[in-house]
Amino acid sequence: MTSNRKNENEIINALSIPTVSNPSTQMNLSPDARIEDSLCVAEVNNIDPFVSASTVQTGINIAGRILGVLGVPFAGQLASFYSFLVGELWPSGRDPWEIFLEHVEQLIRQQVTENTRNTAIARLEGLGRGYRSYQQALETWLDNRNDARSRSIILERYVALELDITTAIPLFRIRNEEVPLLMVYAQAANLHLLLLRDASLFGSEWGMASSDVNQYYQEQIRYTEEYSNHCVQWYNTGLNNLRGTNAESWLRYNQFRRDLTLGVLDLVALFPSYDTRTYPINTSAQLTREIYTDPIGRTNAPSGFASTNWFNNNAPSFSAIEAAIFRPPHLLDFPEQLTIYSASSRWSSTQHMNYWVGHRLNFRPIGGTLNTSTQGLTNNTSINPVTLQFTSRDVYRTESNAGTNILFTTPVNGVPWARFNFINPQNIYERGATTYSQPYQGVGIQLFDSETELPPETTERPNYESYSHRLSHIGLIIGNTLRAPVYSWTHRSADRTNTIGPNRITQIPLVKALNLHSGVTVVGGPGFTGGDILRRTNTGTFGDIRLNINVPLSQRYRVRIRYASTTDLQFFTRINGTTVNIGNFSRTMNRGDNLEYRSFRTAGFSTPFNFLNAQSTFTLGAQSFSNQEVYIDRVEFVPAEVTFEAEYDLERAQKAVNALFTSTNPRRLKTDVTDYHIDQVSNMVACLSDEFCLDEKRELFEKVKYAKRLSDERNLLQDPNFTFISGQLSFASIDGQSNFPSINELSEHGWWGSANVTIQEGNDVFKENYVTLPGTFNECYPNYLYQKIGESELKAYTRYQLRGYIENSQDLEIYLIRYNAKHEAINVPGTESIWSISAESTIGKCTEPNRCAPHYEWNPDLDCSCRDGEKCAHHSHHSTLDIDVGCTDLHENLGVWLIFKIKTQDGHARLGNLEYLEEKPLLGEALRRVKRTEKKWRDKREKLHLETKRVYTEAKESVDALFVDSQYDRLQANSNIGMIHAADKLVHSIREAYLSELPVIRGVNADIFEELEGHILTAFSLYDARNAVKNGDFNNGLTCWNVKGHVDVQQSHHRFDLVVPEWKAEVSQAVRVCPGCGYILRVTAYKEGYGEGCVTIHEIEENTDELNFKNRVEEEIYPPDTGTCKYYTENQGTRTCGNECGSRNEGYDNAYEINAKSSLEYRPTYEEETYTDVRRENHCEYARGYINYSPVPAGYVTKELEYFPETDTVWIEIGETEGKFIVDSVELLLMEE
């Protein structure tokens, strides 16, 4: 790699073999320090083609710069950072995005499709233009934040760019191509999260609404998890796919692990620190993971000499190399002393090599005890061992020669020379290099410079200042004729001293502890933590961290912990052995679950403390659990004066919770505190930060739960949370023909409602279940919900209040009914103007509502001056309605009915948190008023009782007259349809059978009404059974009738009449009969105009009889009509009638499904005077109660004849000579003996 970095130690001829007499001499190398080797040809840049230094350089540079701008950076820092970022990812030269893609393709030997490549590169080019435009606008605005135009431009460009990158991300995770696209995806995801952070930093200043700022923040949190999981998943997939069996496959495997750690996982580890609400000031993060540069062994052998490459020289297997090189999870440590042992490979005096065959490495955790590891041959002292000192030194660069010697025909691979460039980070003037050097005259040499694989973060400063990694450990690959050292490295951000600096949040991974206590293990990190983590399964201490306090000791701090746990537990902390914090922390995952991003939570203690010594020991432990799993990623030290949004949230929540209770009694709920308000306070508490105030949150939750229990206790409603709605029957089922006993006294228990009323799970507005009432297409069939408060729940002379929360409504009617009806019609506009009748809940099985996001509530506090019976244009979402109760009587059990009703097509309502509670005792004028109301009601009830007695007697006599006896199982022979209708009308004149406000609710006279109505239903059924003519009352239109010409069926209330408007029309039906039996043909009809109406019965051409109808008025005024009825026997069909000819009941059930074409209007025989009580008249009584309905309208005549058929089939034919013939019913009744 050609580099222009300013390196004072740069070696001009890096491949020469040093001939320094003292192999451990520290060398102050300069450009003049040149040592030549005439035997070997240097091949400096001949690295494997799939190793792209440019890719690694960009990844390291970006991660390094991000580490400097975590939290809330200064404006100047951020402007400079974005300028750097745009320059790195969209420079003037070759596109780095293409390099990212090609590099991973070469590592895994899989190429993306041409379409994927072209689409991704083109989209990234567009994003580059957008970012450059945004960066320029940001710099302009930062120079003058008060300039309105600059503010408008930056906001416009921000919104456009954020949307663009949001839609672009999916293009970088194409199915089956996720791994080669991974580095592109990670860099793009990083750009998106940094951009989302800007909304939190500047959104308010740009003029964003707080809800918009919060929305961007919530997206940042959501995408952080999504992007992290994707990167870790496909990193692991790609790495596992490269797992092989031989040394060459391990080399590629390790390169993937190293380069994608630098380009992907390092970024992922920093994503959580972009959260400005958790990190509102500058934040120092640390990466403790280890990566491994390539083994120091020849890889560039010329053609024909491939066996001299180390991985072809009888190298160990993949698994053997991995076991020798990859360190098990461990505490972070630093090397202090390296002793290298050598051996000799000699073919002749001109071809020989002394080389590295083993080593002993001393290393130490921060503040911990010294540890030693040995690898290879360490007992050969024939060649003096070389000892190199690294204490307090960062080895930021290694240069190593891979040599090769030929012994007979067997190549020997070894390292005869290595130089370790170092600097003391605590004293920058202490820098230099220490060298291992042995004689070498082999057949080839290859230089390995660690900066080729781990370049500095910038080329603008010397590498001893800008280095990105430091040497942490050394492994050794051992074969029969192979020794290949492998250097491992940690990121420079993981400092040696655990220093807590001023004015910043300091993150310290717990693997930087000086020791591990009994029961603690270090486990491999899940990929997004930036290093290994600690685990305990039982109570005890994790470890001790030696801290260097670089701030005044008066500075106070709070501690936070990033952890994962399968159980609730307590964490405790100690400083120099003194306990400073103990707190409860909640479970974050289930036992057996994999460690995922969401498994970890950052939570802390609210009590601040200060350090007593500049050198202090911090201890973290856990207790109150056993046989569970607790993982610790890091601890964070936060200056106590740092104000978090979480603090404001806690303060607001505390005030809100305390405001639920009275000032004199903190265990008594305020009267004006609604159930809905308690739920909202509960949401407020639930949204508090676990990281900041877990203990306070739990305490507040207990108080809110207690308030909720008090609210439930005072609420007289049954099932206020809408777990079930009983008896959801449609109005058709309570028609005059229904089975009324299906609605009985059980209606006093819980909620009852119509079929279209639905229970919905909680949403962003309601914490618990709520109900929706849609519109209806017929106001006589409303959608409704009701409940009765029993008399036993009420106190005498007390005012009660119904209240609840209405999310939105239109034409919602609310009733409270006792002596009379208190009524209110309510319109409450919501966030949507209207919602579909069939709208379903947006809450899915896997999706929970976000109640922590701020919601814009439409007109939440609109006052309404409406009074009873008036209709408001707009109401408050908080609805209340009062009712006064006088004397109570458990035997009478009057109670209070609560009714919610929608009777318009455009009507709708969403409501919940309903309460019915005692408001106050009645005194003074209120008491006198309720007594007057109660007396009036009792007087009217007495009058109703007397009236009911009279009406019931008349109705019962009329009903009884229809039947042969009191068994009510046989009709009188002369009982016809008109008589049944007449009796039914009398039955329906019984008032107070059902509430006029909602006729599904039984009234005081329901029992006697249902008794008589049951007999009426029996009469209709018996009538249908004895009439041989199918559909003789035309309730089912013309079903079962044969028709020629034009005829109509007209409807008047519940009556259906056949209208024959012209002489050429014909209506007929074939009827099955019993030969030899006698029948009565009975017809009720009306004739308009001239001519005759004829109903004929016959068998083929013989045995014919007829009934003739004339207009009575015409008979008196006009000359007699000479026309006679004709027999319509020709061409009559023999259409059969089966089950399609329904009963009269079926006709009534479908009454409103027939659009009869009425051409005749007539006055009823008599008018009924309708009764109006203290409640308003319910005009829907027409649909079910026969008000103003005439069983036999004026002008209709009933005629009959006897007929004795001789065959099993007769024909009944209807026709006329002229004018209009109207037939109400046709009956063919079997004579009784």
Swiss-Prot record:
GO terms for molecular function: signaling receptor binding; toxin activity. The keyword Transmembrane helix does not apply. It comes from the Bacteria. One of its GO terms (biological process) is sporulation resulting in formation of a cellular spore. Disulfide bonds: none annotated. InterPro entries: Cry1Ac-like_dom-VII, Cry_V, Galactose-bd-like_sf, Pest_crys, Pest_crys_dom-III, Pest_crys_dom_I, Pest_crys_N_sf, Pest_cryst_cen_dom_sf. Keywords: Sporulation, Toxin, Virulence. The keyword Zinc does not apply. SUPFAM superfamilies: delta-Endotoxin (insectocide), middle domain, delta-Endotoxin (insectocide), N-terminal domain, Galactose-binding domain-like. Toxic segment of the protein is located in the N-terminus. Promotes colloidosmotic lysis by binding to the midgut epithelial cells of insects. Belongs to the delta endotoxin family. This is Pesticidal crystal protein Cry1Bc. It comes from Bacillus thuringiensis subsp. morrisoni. The lineage of its organism: Bacteria, Bacillati, Bacillota, Bacilli, Bacillales.
